[in-house]
UniProtKB/Swiss-Prot annotation:
Residue intervals of the S1 motif domain: 622-690
Classification via CDD domains: KH-I_PNPase, RNase_PH_PNPase_1, RNase_PH_PNPase_2, S1_PNPase
GO aspect biological process, one term: RNA processing
This protein's name: Polyribonucleotide nucleotidyltransferase
Species the sequence originates in: Salmonella typhi
Lineage, broadest ranks: Bacteria, Pseudomonadati, Pseudomonadota, Gammaproteobacteria, Enterobacterales
Length: 711
């Protein structure tokens, strides 16, 4: 019989339910978590034995959204879900980042977490629910895991923090921050903000961590009742004698190698030291394992770097703790792009471009929470040559998607509103060199490229990556970390923003015991670094260009009456298609009568505007127009009088005498003056050639309505 065990608790304005023992009983652990009708089913499977020779922790986190959760059938050709979307990949990373550091060092058994969204309330985002589910399932499983963790979303509305705001509330919020941590410490922060102060951001982190304690308590209660026995796993015994022998051979040499400031030269020397040490030790004792020796060497390497930093000595590349690497900033580096920049910080370099398009170029995202249109696209590419390696080149990997989203968050707060700048904007960051913080280099490069493209961003933005080395109560916060300092340190702390405040904050902490005070020091040190970088960037370009690139489409806007929209579109889109082909422009019409004409050639745009004004012009009774015969019938002739309008000249209105045969007087394509006699309720136009000929006044083109044009 199925005997589900359920725990229910209040979490801010939401009710959360944890249920286990009902489904997936062959998995190591499974939990159904629901928050106000948004439900995520999370399973964990762990292998009891590690694969022979396994030298890393193979944790996989999969997050998948099922369209049935929202009562929909997939819109794809096969009518089923396919590869993970960008959003699913980002949430999988959001789950992975806080749980990964909580597995004990040396644990290399394969573990897989699968979170499946099975029901969704459009007001409750499933990401927090999935994070709570992963924490609960891992805690129940008995797998060595130093959790549970809690997770919370924090908004900032009317100068107040809001716990787990609804989707509607998020639209009003100046902050969207996700924080995860254990009972004692914060482990992960991911956020975007509308240029908020350091104190406000830190307050949000602390608020979220305090509020999520109720989640941790509920999971602990569930584990007491339904948790599986803890695995009898012990780390391999430390071989002190072997450690000492390896240290004697390699420590001083590695210490010298880490004084080489050039990354590639340093890596080559470290590799030589490691391979020579391993060869010598195996020659002395063939029973030794090369993987084990490699791990000991890595630990020595880590200790060399960390102890030097804690002792106040210069860093790997000779800098002090708060120094920024040398900067080189250039704009307009690519002649035919709409905007471009090359941003170099030490051995990290990004070639960034900005491309302008029309509303038609915006990306339509069919997401579980509903369809939305994204008019600001940010793509980050990390080719293998950027770190001097060979490798696969193709579709973006999880890391590239995550870094691209972080960089986008950094720039989003300063992007202009669509009503002021009606362009779709795509930024692409090509990482051409990398040695730490390429995502923050992408933020700096994007700000420069957007200004070079003439995009009226509200302020310049820059990003910086901070690091931390901590032993006991002794700690050092590092500015502008290298790749090695990220890898060997205890924290990766990325901050982007303008002179006025923070636009994005991402934090990943590998150890417990990071206090509010340490985070405060890191944020303040990051602010100084950010302002320094902005100062250098402003020397290259200190404001958006006054005009967009000559190669970018210019969008001209006019307004027409809503009842004229059908005339411009035509039957089945025939008129607007013909206009687009005739004028060589792109034309978009909105429901309120706003017409946007995009063209790289100003004359083509003016011609398109003139043609639209002709089509939408009102026909004036009693006025004479030039016309062209389009169709001849027994009872008269149909003529076009400009702007796609057609009227009938009855046989009795062709001449001032009796007409027996229309073709005796008119031929197809013939141009004749006509006078408007009447426009009936159906919009049909009755015309006269006879009366137009009798009158002496010259013919006129249709009068165009007054229009508003904005470039």
């Amino acid at each position: 019989m199925l005997n589900p065990i359920v725990r229910e608790f209040q979490y801010g304005q939401h009710t959360v339910t944890l249920e286990t023992g009902m489904m997936a009983r062959q998995a190591t652990a499974a939990v159904m978590v629901s928050m106000d009708d948004t439900a995520v089913f999370v399973t964990v499977v762990g292998q009891k034995k590690a694969k022979p020779g396994q030298d890393f922790f193979p944790l996989t986190v999969n997050y998948q959204e099922r369209t049935y959760a929202a009562g929909r059938i997939p819109g794809s050709f096969f009518r089923r879900e396919g590869r993970p979307s960008e959003g699913e990949t980002l949430i999988a990373r959001l789950i992975d980042r806080p749980v990964r550091p909580l597995f004990p060092e040396g644990f290399v058994n394969e573990v897989q977490v699968i979170a499946t969204v099975v029901s969704v309330n459009p007001q409750v985002n499933p990401d927090i629910v999935a994070m709570i589910g992963a924490s609960a399932a891992l805690s129940l499983s008995g797998i060595p895991f130093n959790g549970p963790i809690g997770a919370a979303r924090v908004g900032y509305i009317n100068d107040q923090y809001v716990l787990n705001p609804t989707q509607d509330e998020l639209k009003e919020s100046k902050l969207d921050l996700v924080v995860a941590g254990t009972e004692a410490a914060v482990l992960m922060v991911e956020s975007e903000a509308e240029l908020l102060s350091e104190d406000t951001m830190l307050g949000a982190v602390v608020f979220g961590h305090e509020q999520q304690q109720v989640v941790i308590q509920a999971i602990n209660d569930l584990v007491k009742e339904a948790g599986k026995p803890r695995w009898d796993w012990q780390p391999e015994a430390v071989n002190d004698a072997l450690n000492a022998r390896v240290a004697a051979l390699a420590e001083s040499r590695l210490s010298d190698a880490y004084r080489i400031t050039d990354k590639q030269e340093r890596y080559a020397q470290v590799d030589v030291i490691k391979s020579e040490t391993i060869e010598q030790l195996i020659a002395e004792d063939e029973t030794l394992d090369a993987n084990e020796l490699g791990e000991i060497l890595h630990a020595i390497e880590k200790n060399v770097v960390r102890s030097r930093v804690l002792a106040g000595e210069p860093r790997i590349d000779g800098r002090e703790k708060d120094m920024i690497r040398g900067l080189d900033v250039r704009t307009g580096v690519l002649p035919r792009t709409h905007g471009s920049a090359l941003f170099t910080r030490g051995e990290t370099q990004a070639l960034v471009t900005a491309t302008l398009g029309t509303a038609r170029d915006a990306q339509v995202l069919d997401e579980l929470m509903g369809e939305r249109t994204d008019s600001f696209l940010f793509h980050y590419n990390f080719p293998p040559y950027s770190v001097g390696e060979t490798g696969m080149v193709g579709s973006p990997k999880r890391r590239e998607i995550g870094h691209g989203r972080l960089a986008k968050r950094g720039v989003l707060a300063v992007m202009p509103d669509m009503d002021k700048f009606p362009y779709t904007v795509r930024v692409v960051s090509e990482i051409t060199e990398s040695n730490g913080s390429s995502s923050m280099a992408s933020v700096c490069g994007a700000s420069l490229a957007l200004m070079d493209a003439g995009v009226p961003i509200k302020a310049a933005v820059a990003g910086i990556a901070m690091g931390l080395v901590k032993e006991g109560d002794n700690y050092v916060v590092l500015s502008d970390i290298l790749g090695d300092e990220d890898h060997l340190g205890d924290m990766d702390f990325k901050v982007a923003g303008s002179r006025d405040g923070i636009s994005a904050l991402q934090m990943d902490i590998k150890i417990e015991g990071i206090t509010k005070e340490i985070m405060q020091v890191a944020l303040n040190q990051a602010k100084g670094a950010r302002l320094h970088i902005l100062g250098v960037m402003e020397q290259a370009i200190n404001a958006p260009r006054g005009d967009i690139s000559e190669f970018a489409p210019r969008i001209h806007t006019i307004k027409i009456s809503t009842d004229k929209i059908k005339d411009v579109i035509g039957k089945g889109g025939s008129v607007i298609r013909a206009l687009t082909e005739e004028t060589g422009t792109t034309i978009e019409i909105e429901d309120d009568g706003t017409v946007k004409i995009a063209a790289t050639d100003g004359e083509k745009a003016k011609y398109a505007i003139r043609r639209i004004e002709e089509i939408t012009a009102e026909i004036e009774v009693g006025r004479i127009y030039n016309s062209k015969v389009t169709r001849i019938v027994d009872f008269g002739a149909f003529v076009a009088i400009g702007g796609g309008k057609e009227g009938l000249v009855h046989i009795s209105q062709i001449a001032d005498k009796r007409v027996e045969k229309v073709t005796d007087y008119l031929q197809m394509g013939q141009e004749v003056p006509v006078k408007v006699l009447e426009v009936d309720r159906q919009g049909r136009v009755r015309l006269s050639i006879k009366e137009a000929t009798e009158q002496s006044q010259p013919a006129a083109a249709p009068e165009a309505p007054a229009s508003e044009q904005a470039e």
